[in-house]
Regions:
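Noncatalytic regulatory segments and standalone regulatory/sensor domains
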Residues: 1, 106, 116, 121-128, ...
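Alpha-helix boundary/capping residues
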Residues: 47-50, 108, 171
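A broad, low-specificity signal marking well-ordered, structured residues that form hydrophobic/aromatic
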Residues: 44-47, 111, 132, 144
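Hydrophobic, well-ordered secondary-structure segments
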Residues: 26, 98, 131, 143-144
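Short coil/turn linker and secondary-structure boundary residues
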Residues: 1, 38, 92, 96, ...
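Active-site-adjacent structural segments surrounding the nucleophilic cysteine of cysteine proteases
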Residues: 1-73, 117, 125, 140-141
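Predominantly the structural core of cysteine protease catalytic domains
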Residues: 57-137, 176-177
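Generic structural signal of hydrophobic/aromatic residues within well-ordered alpha-helices
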Residues: 43-44, 101, 164
């Protein structure tokens, strides 16, 4: 543990282009693991990016990640990383989420979480989905630090773990664990 938080070090915040939160987050993960040759644009070209057009349901904006999408991406570029997905319905409550985050950070596993962005910040009507990297947890396990690719509110943000748990549930997502 370092200071008041257990933190995973990420070298650089990559600011997301609109609807590129997944590519920007993956660029940060790749840089953390020593892969500097791919940008969010390169990553986006390999993933299906759906623009925020009026005729498209906002739930469908951005990258549509399915089973093995990330592993297929790693395989295509000969990147020696592996993604294991933990759906939120496999985690009972925020206490179990805290235990899982601590365990994964202790194992030096990068944790990307998918969640309902608006829900996390109090708007329970919106369906805007987003991803960030969980980089730390407070010593009392009540707060987590997210590295958010933005573009809005990019950078390190501390949120309550119970709010994050609820936002992950609202987004029907989970933890993308990369090692």
């Amino acid at each position: 543990m370092t200071g008041d938080n257990m933190e995973k070090y990420i070298e650089e915040t990559v600011i997301s282009k609109p609807n590129y939160c997944v590519p920007a987050t993956l660029e940060m993960v790749l840089k953390h693991h020593g892969v500097f040759s791919l940008t969010q644009d390169d990553i986006a070209s390999q993933l299906q990016i759906i623009p925020n057009e009026e005729y498209v349901d906002p739930v469908m904006w951005g990258a549509q990640i399915r089973k093995d999408t990330i592993n297929d991406f790693f395989f295509f570029f000969f990147i020696a990383l592996h993604e294991t997905y933990i759906p939120i319905n496999h985690i009972i409550d925020e206490y179990m989420l805290a235990e899982k985050v601590i365990s994964l950070l202790n194992e030096n596993i990068t944790i990307i979480c998918g969640y309902n962005y608006s829900y996390l910040y109090g708007n329970h009507e919106s369906t805007y989905r987003h991803v960030s990297i969980i980089v730390g947890i407070s010593t009392d396990y009540s707060n987590v630090t997210l590295l958010d690719p933005g573009p809005k509110n990019a950078g390190y943000n501390t949120v309550r773990i119970d709010s994050l748990f609820d936002a992950i549930k609202a987004g029907k997502d989970g933890l993308w664990c990369i090692s």
